[in-house]
């Protein structure tokens, strides 16, 4: 799908908006890592005085999206120009196919929901800061949009079209590497709102002394060309990369060659050449090639100073260096706590020179004041040493889960054995006159599907979910979790059972059934009977919960006795589907002075830290440590680290996974014809792979 001109549409939005999907960072993708998409949004906001810029964020990233992913991706779009986030998405409930609708889901059902306020408050503060003041850039980059139109065909592709897109992506990426401040210009917007005022190229509320034609820019819209002519004659500066344009409105035109000979038209061979010719003093990064990581910045002008937001998009390298800009003093504004503190700088001739050191996925929000602020005494640098502690005791917080996603099905006179639940659902809907689950394949018009709930006698189906139980399992702990618990008859080994009043698991609308009295050692089956058929009867997995471990079989999994947990992957310790918290606990003698907890090798969406029963904070991103000084006691202390998993392992997808970071409804639709062996399920490693450490001051 090709959009004709995104920026042209943004010009008419009161809150320009973009949708950033997935959890990938390919430079040439249309999502995270695609600088152009967000810079278009921000540029139009600058040019039209729009205070807010909206992004729908995190959709289709999968249930496994971590706090570090969310912070990193959010920081990236905020530093490029977003300042208002609409998180994708909050499910009213997870029943049926809803849980497959481009997850992540953000609500009470999600295992990490209890810790999410930390991130929400962080982005709320960033939203305030980065919608304050104005971003004022002096350089305009013309987009090669009309050039791409020359190569576009609805019936066949042209290699040059992809080449232009890749070239422009790479060009913007290199500008960001050198921290060049610029806006993008859309020729369609220039047609309606462009002008020249003196030696300034104007788009509505913004004016630019420098215009850049990027590589592969081959065509001018007629109005743009006329403005460029006037701009050059009035003293404006054009930098042209590569071959000069040769077309106006898609036709060869010698006038382009004539203006390219103008004294203010400069042929430019590469970005380094451009850097040597333009003024970067507004934000001057020293020695950018040695900074490391993947650094971005945004600078916004206020009446009494400037806001600077720095982010490091890399997950593996620090970004470390120095920059200078106009100002007299600097404060760090902590977007996690709302506190501000003095930032040591070197001031000279109304400019400040400051250093930064951002860990992977790190960020820093600064206020550079025009006024001298008396410095506060620097905090003494604390030297930490690792405590010697006993190994953590480890405990599962919630019951273990088994996801049953293969069924035996009877619908009408047809019987099917060992088929994937979604395949079974298709057969049910087809038998009742639908090509697919109507809640999946279409959008209900008014009450269209609700009114279709008129199935007669003789319709319906029965689905059976088999599972084996080994010797020694704590049968008394076993429960079943079934969606829409009052919709159908539920049986365990032929005995009808009712949901436990007031109990739920995973989602408020899902029922919990006591199966402890009916489960036997050996083969068991949970059955659901739907007679007559209902429009609400979406076949989904059923879950067994309780105190057990799981052992992979040639087909699926077997319940076996629960064993003690150790550090290492949960899925290798009988918890392949477990989504919630595991508690790692240490008891240590009296602590005084600065103390911090540090996680070593670990996998999880987030970790919450408790000291003596009181929540001290969370660990979700590098450097994976937390100061717990104010929570420790001079007497014995109990330190608990709760590592949180995700719904990826519980809800899937478990079979049709082609790439991490992209999860769509189709990811859940396909699976092997018969249930594969347990080890073939696609599951993630969660847990502390190494014990956590406690550091105290020397």
Segments and roles (model prediction):
Residues 372-391, 531-558, 645-696:
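Glycine/proline-rich low-complexity spacer/linker segments in large multi-domain proteins
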Residues 484-490, 601-608:
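Extended, low-complexity, turn-rich repeat/linker tracts enriched in Gly/Pro/Ser/Thr and Asp/Glu
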Residues 1-16, 20-479, 483-485, 490-538, ...:
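Carbohydrate-binding surfaces of carbohydrate-active enzymes
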Residues 577, 581-585, 595-599:
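A conserved, well-ordered hydrophobic junction motif at loop->secondary-structure transitions
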Residues 461-463, 544, 582-584, 688:
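Hydrophobic core residues within well-ordered beta-strands of beta-rich domains
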Residues 198-199, 214, 223-224, 254, ...:
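C-terminal structured "cap/appendage" subdomains that terminate the fold
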Residues 611:
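A cytosolic small-molecule/anion-sensing beta-strand core signal
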